[in-house]
């Protein structure tokens, strides 16, 4: 899908034609690639017009060549077409968390329920499945097979036609057994064009089980037709997000993604294959980076972001020191990512004033430091937003879940929390000293 765009980037960056001619050729190539992927013609020409406007109005920064700057503009506008800077909230906002899956027949909804269960289980959550699709005879059996494969329990009532009752009883059972995340697979008996009936059924089950989140499953082969379904769903559900399946098996994936993004409905995951682990968190910028050719784009983006990251961290630490803001694990995560972008730890240490006077730090110690940073990032990736913003709630049970989800030991999670607490105490001490110095100078001035 959208391979033509990647080819156009290679041709543009490596070509020998003049810049102006190369730009015109690239714009024609990108229009052709998007239209063949079933993106609406109106959206395609709107995109290329925005690119042309920016080329006229903006000047390339000094550290980028003109061709690199052009690709950066294309990257920005394609990202906006597929959803912009929206980072999907993957981790549950609270525990327990109930997800209700809805979708028309043939979208791969039941398979997606299993993939979703596997995704969260790998992150350390205690997950269960409820099979409430009573209209497709093999749905429950399929879900049970998937549950057995990934070692996740499945609740169902063979032969029953009471979809609402099954959903209610299944959710109640698993919540009483202290499961952290319950996924309900609902009926998908309606086809494309029957969105109203689908949404009515969704409402009935929703009122009985009161899920925290409703996810609509859409087949990528719908292309731009996905707009109507996504729009109705987005208007009907204020806790809704979308999974687009079968992205690997159709040329219309770009059309489906752009159509859904145009409705404002958040796309949370995309299905990229039949295997149980082939469900990806959808990040528009990462997706666009991939279709543009990751290697070519990364160097350009890193040049643009290096200074932004550094300035952002400086600003945050200034706010913490003045008491305007508090330090969180989310801030620590950003700091580690920013440090790693600057290059190997050994080179970074050489840049710190005074380090060269202390002699060389043993290479094995530097390597341990780099490994620890990577493991800490993995640990923080397995935390909920609540935990990242308020680490004080992380008790022994949460530590065990986080360790399991990140493939680390509980002791490593505890070490990270203790390090964070030490940093907080140090900052408080520095803040007090700063106030004492200001007070002293005030007295001297008086």
From Swiss-Prot:
GO terms (BP aspect): SRP-dependent cotranslational protein targeting to membrane
**InterPro entries membership:** AAA+_ATPase, P-loop_NTPase, Signal_recog_part_SRP54_M_sf, Signal_recog_particl_SRP54_hlx, Signal_recog_particle_SRP54_M, SRP/SRP_N, SRP54, SRP54_GTPase_dom
Q: Where does GTP bind?
A: 103-110, 185-189, 245-248
PROSITE patterns found in the cross-reference section: SRP54
According to the record, the segments passing through the membrane are none
Q: Where in the cell is it found?
A: Cytoplasm
Cite the GO molecular-function annotations of the record: 7S RNA binding; ATP hydrolysis activity; GTP binding; GTPase activity
UniProt superkingdom: Archaea
CDD domains attached to this UniProt entry: SRP54_G (cd17875)
Q: Which reactions appear under catalytic activity for this entry?
A: GTP + H2O = GDP + phosphate + H(+)
Q: What is its EC number?
A: 3.6.5.4
Please tell me one Gene Ontology term that the record gives under cellular component: signal recognition particle
Which is a Pfam family this sequence falls into? Answer: SRP_SPB
Domain comment text? Composed of three domains: the N-terminal N domain, which is responsible for interactions with the ribosome, the central G domain, which binds GTP, and the C-terminal M domain, which binds the RNA and the signal sequence of the RNC.
The record's HAMAP family line, in alphabetical order, gives:
SRP54
Protein name listed in UniProt: Signal recognition particle 54 kDa protein
């Amino acid at each position: 899908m959208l391979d033509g765009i990647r080819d156009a980037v290679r041709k543009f960056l490596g070509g020998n034609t003049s810049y102006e001619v190369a730009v015109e050729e690239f714009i024609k190539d990108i229009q052709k690639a998007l239209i063949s992927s079933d993106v609406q013609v109106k959206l395609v020409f709107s995109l290329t017009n925005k690119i042309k406007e920016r080329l006229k109005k903006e000047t390339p920064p000094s550290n980028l060549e003109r061709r690199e700057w052009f690709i950066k503009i294309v990257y920005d506008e394609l990202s906006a077409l597929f959803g912009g800077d929206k980072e999907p909230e993957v981790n549950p906002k609270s525990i327990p968390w109930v997800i209700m899956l809805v979708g028309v027949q043939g979208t791969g909804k039941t398979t997606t329920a299993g993939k979703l269960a596997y995704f969260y289980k790998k992150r350390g959550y205690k997950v269960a499945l409820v099979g409430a699709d009573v209209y497709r005879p093999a749905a429950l059996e399929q879900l049970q097979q998937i549950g057995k494969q990934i070692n996740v329990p499945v609740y169902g009532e063979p032969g029953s036609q009471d979809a609402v009752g099954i959903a209610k009883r299944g959710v109640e059972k698993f919540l009483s057994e202290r499961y952290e995340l319950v996924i309900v697979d609902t009926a998908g008996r309606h086809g494309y064009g029957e969105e109203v009936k689908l949404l009515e059924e969704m409402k009935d089950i929703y009122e009985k089980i009161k899920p925290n989140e409703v996810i609509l499953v859409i087949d990528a082969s719908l292309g731009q037709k996905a707009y109507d379904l996504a729009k109705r769903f987005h208007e009907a559900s204020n806790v809704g997000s979308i999974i687009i399946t079968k992205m690997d098996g159709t040329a219309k994936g770009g059309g489906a993604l752009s159509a859904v993004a145009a409705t404002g409905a958040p796309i949370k995951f995309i299905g990229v294959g039949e295997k149980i682990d082939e469900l990806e968190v959808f990040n528009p910028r990462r997706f666009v980076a991939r279709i543009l050719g990751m290697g070519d784009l990364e160097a350009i983006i890193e040049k643009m972001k290096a200074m932004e990251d550094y300035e952002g961290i400086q600003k945050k630490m200034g706010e913490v020191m003045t008491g305007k803001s508090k330090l969180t694990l989310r801030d620590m995560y950003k700091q580690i990512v920013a440090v790693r972008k600057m290059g190997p730890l050994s080179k970074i240490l050489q840049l710190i004033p005074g380090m060269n006077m202390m002699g060389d730090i043993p290479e094995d110690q530097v390597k341990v430091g780099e490994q620890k940073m990577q493991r800490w990032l993995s640990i923080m990736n397995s935390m909920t937003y609540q935990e990242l913003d308020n680490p004080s709630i992380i008790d022994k049970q949460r530590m065990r879940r986080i360790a399991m989800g990140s493939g680390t030991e509980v002791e490593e999670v505890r070490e990270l929390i203790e390090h964070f607490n030490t940093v907080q105490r140090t900052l408080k001490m520095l803040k007090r000293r700063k106030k004492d110095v200001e007070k002293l100078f005030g007295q001297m001035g008086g």
